A protein has these predicted regions:
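Acidic, Ser/Thr-rich low-complexity intrinsically disordered segments
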Residues: 135-168, 612-615
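Short, well-ordered beta-strand elements
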Residues: 19-24, 92-102
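Structural detector for internal amphipathic alpha-helices that build alpha-solenoid repeat scaffolds
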Residues: 150-162, 184-199, 218-232, 251-287, ...
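Intrinsically disordered terminal tails
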Residues: 377-402, 407-615
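Amphipathic alpha-helical scaffolding segments comprising HEAT/armadillo-like alpha-solenoid repeats
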Residues: 129-139, 162-178, 199-211, 233-246, ...
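Coil residues (strongly favoring Ser/Thr
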Residues: 15, 35-36, 50-51, 77, ...
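Surface-exposed amphipathic alpha-helical segments
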Residues: 1, 47-48, 97-138, 575-606, ...
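Signature of long, low-cysteine stretches enriched in small and polar/charged residues
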Residues: 1-89, 191-193, 204, 222, ...
């Protein structure tokens, strides 16, 4: 239990079918938090941060043994059902009991007696989460007791350190040697902790480490990554001095620019750091700071290791209006000639693909659309070419070679490249044929993307009027939910009026077949669509807290609570009226959004989890 624990058990009443969820929680040995108020709030709002909960009862008290208790009963609008929870906490050890009841009747004897008599045993000793654990951690790490040392190594990432711990952290980093099992991983984890200590002495020590580790390039990456995680001008200046004179050789794809914020929007929203050893992606976290050291970064365009990452970083700055053409004009010629070469490669690849497709069609060996979503024919775009376009576009007025090059990209047979180039021109108010908007509006796989992109750019009036209707946009938005395995057929069935969370509109129903030879149709839905034919969707960005036991950056996510657009596995029956089946499906998807016991409990095990949609 030294590493922390969370356990669940469901107590069943076989006679009444009632269930009570019993949970146990123990803080890890090195857990530390400064915010006791936030801790209390977590226990008082266990069922999430959703403001639509109706609190029927709330009580906080302290038992004679100094164990804190919280009791909470909440309900939802339009429902007589309620959740009843009671929590207990003392020195890093917590218990909770939770159940579902009905406000129309009194709790049963089973439920009432359990809640009234449940008292956790206080024999299990925990740790005070409000006391710093750094001294305990360092003592364990340097201990001759292998059990204590291994425990500390295992939980390096859990320990919370600040500037007062810098001296001890330096001691353990320098104390380590190759006799340590998993030496590189352990030392890397310790160096990563320096990224949490955002002081000048810490930055100076990271610089010292960088040069001392010149024979272990992987650890040099960690030193640079931690340095950039400080997000201070001093640290960035130290990084500039290093990268300008002694840039490390990049191996093992370390130079591949992988912005983790793209893959994990939760991390981006939280502002949390992310240790992956790829220090270059840290530069995009604070573009304004990166702009101050840009002159030292641009020469790296001449190094193959760094070229791609620096180009993408420069592209982000161009998009953010942080750089002007004059800031990198000395590299214009290099970018232009490389872009022309890339365009030639794109043209050759497109011709080759067209020939291969013709041969496949001739031999009737086309890949199954169900399995691969037309992977044999699907356009993939050209990220490199799009990036060159972004970097060269600022020279549109001053250099006559830019416009013809980008116009050639618009003529590409690759629809992804064509679409991205069109959006780039649209974003920067550059001319392009209006026929392109009609072309992409006519395509099911692009129509909804075009609609949302134009809306985001605040030029919705340029969306083709011919396709600005619920049915065409509905089919396209539905298909956008399929990243692969495109259905063979999607056919509109009917629509039903409904109301959800104060918004009234339609749920559109479609039937689809995954494969042409499927015997039955399945149902899909699109909505909630406003009644106004000129509007297609309600905007919303609800933030949902997952659980009080989850820590940032994974404690919440954002979604549109008015979106019911999805493919279902519900089959359309031939022996039942279609409208009745649609009404039944509508009730099901609306009920699925309720905070119901069906989602709160996992019937097949002793585990429990909150609903995926608790709004």
């Amino acid at each position: 239990l030294e590493g922390g624990a969370f356990r669940n058990k469901i107590i069943n009443n076989d006679t009444t079918g009632e269930k009570i969820l019993v949970s146990f929680y123990r803080s890890p040995r090195y857990y530390y938090t400064k915010d006791s108020v936030s801790f209390d709030n977590d226990n008082e709002t266990y069922f999430g941060s959703d403001s639509t909960w109706i609190v029927r009862y709330k009580k906080k008290s302290v038992l004679p043994n100094k164990m804190k208790t919280w009791e909470l009963i909440v309900t939802d609008t339009g429902s007589s059902r309620a959740f009843w929870r009671k929590s207990f906490y003392k020195d890093g050890v917590g218990f909770s009991i939770a159940t579902q009841t009905d406000t129309l009747s009194q709790p049963s004897t089973f439920i009432r007696s359990f809640f009234e008599s449940f008292v956790p045993a206080d024999t299990l000793k925990g740790v005070n989460p409000f006391e710093k654990k750094s001294h305990l951690f360092f003592a364990d790490f340097l201990s001759n007791d292998s059990v204590l040392h291994k425990r500390a190594v295992k939980h390096i990432n859990d320990i919370d350190l600040d500037s007062s711990d810098l001296s001890q952290l330096k001691t353990v980093i320098e104390w380590m040697n190759w006799k340590e099992k998993k030496y590189l991983d352990t030392k890397a984890s310790l160096i990563n902790k320096l990224g949490d200590i955002k002081t000048k002495p810490s930055a100076d020590y990271l610089k010292q480490l960088y040069y001392a580790l010149d024979d272990t390039v992987q650890l040099q990456y960690n030193a640079l990554e931690s340095l950039l995680q400080h997000k201070t001008q001093y640290a960035y200046n130290v990084f500039r001095d290093i990268i300008n004179t002694e840039p490390p050789v990049l191996i093992n794809s370390i130079g591949d620019y992988a912005d983790y914020r793209y893959y994990s929007p939760l991390l981006a929203a939280s502002g949390s750091g992310f240790d992956n050893g790829k220090f270059l992606d840290e530069l995009s976290d604070s573009l304004k700071l990166t702009r101050t050291i840009l002159p030292a970064l641009l020469p790296l365009l001449n190094l193959e290791d760094y070229k791609s990452a620096i180009m993408k970083l420069l592209g982000e700055m161009v998009d953010s209006n942080l750089v002007k053409p004059k800031d990198y004009e000395m590299y214009f010629g290099k970018l232009m000639i490389e872009a022309k070469q890339e365009l030639k490669k794109q043209s050759i690849a497109e011709k080759k693909k067209a020939i291969e497709k013709a041969e496949v069609d001739k031999e009737e060996k086309k890949v199954s659309v169900y399995s691969y979503y037309d992977d044999a024919d699907k356009d993939t775009g050209n990220d490199d070419l799009s990036l060159y376009a972004t970097l060269l576009l600022p020279y549109w007025e001053t250099n006559t070679t830019v416009s013809p090059l980008i116009q050639q990209m618009l003529k590409s047979n690759d629809k992804v490249l064509k679409y991205n180039t069109m959006l780039l021109l649209l974003k920067h108010n550059k001319p392009f044929p209006d026929s392109l908007l009609t072309f992409f509006g006519s395509l099911d796989e692009y129509r909804y993307s075009l609609y949302t992109d134009l809306k985001q750019l605040k030029v919705s009036d340029r969306f083709p009027a011919l396709y600005n209707n619920h049915l065409d946009l509905g089919k396209s938005s539905l298909l956008s939910k399929k990243t692969y395995g495109k259905p063979d057929s999607v056919v509109y069935v009917d629509r039903l009026i409904t109301e959800y969370k104060g918004k009234k509109g339609f749920i559109y129903f479609y039937k689809y077949k995954a494969k042409k030879d499927d015997l039955t149709w399945k149902l899909a839905t699109v909505g909630l669509v406003p009644e106004d034919p000129k509007q297609f969707e309600y905007e919303d960005s609800t933030t949902y807290s997952i659980s009080p036991f989850d820590t940032a950056p994974f404690s919440s996510y954002t979604y549109n609570k008015y979106s019911f657009t999805e493919f279902s596995d519900t089959k359309l029956k031939e022996d039942e009226a279609v409208v009745d089946q649609l009404k039944k499906r509508l009730r099901k998807i609306l009920y699925s959004r309720r905070k119901s016991a069906a989602n709160f409990y996992d019937e097949d095990s002793d585990k429990a989890s909150p609903s995926d949609y608790m709004d």
